[in-house]
């Protein structure tokens, strides 16, 4: 049984560049939709996210940009927060891994794993720069590929032949920054023995929600676990307590950021212990939203780290993954010019158009593609032609004919059948949201709009108006507005601005939204919302919900 308290996290965006549509539809829009849905259900929701601010990509790019590390991550942390706001991502708190609470809890995780014999030190050979006086991680190294002989191969992968290897396997390795020759030296690192938790992890993944194809990948991954280094030779990161000049690997510290970010939130609301009711209570339902490339870290490695703790940290109940969103058939890449400027896009097209289309093409079980042609088609045929048309034509007819106050009409059987079908579709939408399917939710939204349009066409109130049958006209308008009320409800998680406009225009007397945060509507998806027997509507002049995309 699902808890009344819901913890939601989404993969921490890496503070190394702007977010693109692929990031949004992969982790942040699905998490936001689920959070909005659960709030509507009356659940106590906490949605935590934040910037992932350590790691080699950050140090290397900051150095190449001539910026300090903190200055560099500050820039992208602000950019990510702004992007979340522009896209209507209703995160309850957006923290960062440079927060005050992060170092202590990361080091505590490490010590607990040590005490349980799950972390042990090991001496290995790593590349060292005499000129720079330090060990260099793979991103700082270039050299000759050991497979194909390409002389500018990266430290972890050859971009010429695609081979992957350890940086120390490169021939003639040199520093990416200075070009200096490198040599091998012994260095000590800590390793997490994941293979010692194999049985615990297999049992754990059997009890959580995973998409079927992801479950197969995770099970196979656990079968082939091996020790994994948790420390690196860097200066930027969380210091390792018992190893000098070492910091934790970003994959080790980043997921702990969900917990430290919740501590950060608790402090911000003046209740420092509030984080415990989400992380130390196993009755909480915890849903995590990620891209598929983060699966192993969230399905296996972070749960393994939690298993090795003295505190009973909450483990994920539903790990909701997305495949990749492509742009016109290719991966989003700013360096290759294959990207869309999000700010410019939102200056031209409404937010709900973008949210709807990204949800409708969400890459839930396979890669999907964003193209402007499909964006245009969906906006014009679905949002304008079906959805907006239904709302506008009903309200325009009602206002034109002075039928703006509607209540308790005498309904015929065909009206009751229409209401019943509308309710069934709304309940279907709830099931789709609960099962993390934005695609199916979008289909159901359009199905309900089409049902409403069909009913209005079939009943043809304009003909009845000419005959002077105003009681019947009002009954039809009442049923159509009731359908629009349900349409607004099931649309809200994906198109919040549009849903609120509909509710404002039909003004159902059963709702008092004045005291609610429009970004966090609470406790509306209830049995009383579906009751039409006492409902009344006060209709306003219609406002076009969507315009055509040229």
Swiss-Prot record:
Broad class of enzyme this protein falls into: ligase
- Predominantly, its location class is cytoplasm
Molecular function in Gene Ontology = ATP binding; metal ion binding; methionine-tRNA ligase activity
Question: Where does the chain bind ATP?
Answer: 334
The reactions it catalyses are: tRNA(Met) + L-methionine + ATP = L-methionyl-tRNA(Met) + AMP + diphosphate
Task: Show the stretches that span the lipid bilayer.
Answer: none
The answer on whether this UniProt entry bears the keyword Metal-binding reads yes
Residues bound to Zn(2+): 145, 148, 158, 161
Localization per record: Cytoplasm
Arranged from A to Z, the UniProt key words for this protein are: Aminoacyl-tRNA synthetase, ATP-binding, Cytoplasm, Ligase, Metal-binding, Nucleotide-binding, Protein biosynthesis, Zinc
What are the EC numbers? 6.1.1.10
Motif 'HIGH' region in this chain: where? 13-23
What cofactor is this protein dependent on?
A: Zn(2+)
The GO biological-process annotations, alphabetized, read as: methionyl-tRNA aminoacylation
| Extent of motif 'KMSKS' region | 331-335
Query: Which terms in the GO cellular component ontology are assigned?
Result: cytosol
Note describing how the cofactor binds: Binds 1 zinc ion per subunit.
Tell me, in a sentence or two, what this protein's role is: Is required not only for elongation of protein synthesis but also for the initiation of all mRNA translation through initiator tRNA(fMet) aminoacylation.
Spell out the family assignment given in the record's similarity comment.
Answer: Belongs to the class-I aminoacyl-tRNA synthetase family. MetG type 1 subfamily.
Q: How does it assemble?
A: Monomer.
- What is this protein called in UniProt? Methionine--tRNA ligase
